[in-house]
């Protein structure tokens, strides 16, 4: 089998928030020191839709990486985290998703590369919105037709449960 540190094992936090899961992954030593630079530059991926959280995640992940490099005796120059993308993870894979080709060019390039990868590991804490369906709710469910169709045709079609609504909650999706 393969582990988190192995080459080619791409890790995604699709709802990175302020970067806690990625920073803890780096800090826990689950990635071997010899693999750290490769993993950081090419195999760690994090998506966030809220701009403030996106910037906080960038600072947290980049600072953690820099600190780890210093502990390993190779502080080197500061390196921005290339795996961070400003996006709605679910909407990004919808058929009607329209990338911003004018303003967020580099961000869109990162997203297209991510979508072509074989993601092996998903970490993180997705948004919680069960039972919410109004824009007035704290965290209303958004419709994702392609994702919902895939759930309907696979998990829901094979389920014996009578209440399938929770399958479409963002926490479960």
Give the ranges of each region predicted by the language model.
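SAM-dependent methyltransferase catalytic region
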Residues: 1-173
């Amino acid at each position: 089998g393969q582990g988190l540190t192995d080459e080619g094992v791409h890790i995604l936090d699709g709802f990175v928030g302020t970067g806690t899961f990625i920073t803890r992954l780096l800090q826990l030593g689950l990635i071997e020191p010899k693999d750290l630079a490769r993993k950081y530059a090419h195999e760690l991926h994090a998506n966030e839709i809220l701009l403030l959280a996106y910037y906080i995640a960038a600072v947290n992940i980049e600072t953690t990486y820099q600190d780890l490099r210093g502990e390993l005796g190779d502080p080197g120059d500061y390196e921005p985290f290339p795996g961070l993308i400003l996006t709605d993870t679910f909407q990004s894979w919808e058929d009607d998703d329209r990338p911003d080709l004018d303003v967020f060019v580099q961000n869109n390039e990162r997203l297209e590369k991510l979508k072509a990868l074989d993601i092996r590991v998903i970490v993180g804490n997705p948004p919680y919105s069960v039972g919410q369906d109004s824009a007035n709710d704290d965290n209303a469910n958004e419709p994702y037709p392609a994702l919902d169709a895939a759930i309907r045709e696979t998990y829901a079609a094979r389920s014996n449960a009578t209440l399938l609504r929770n399958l479409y909650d963002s926490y479960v999706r």
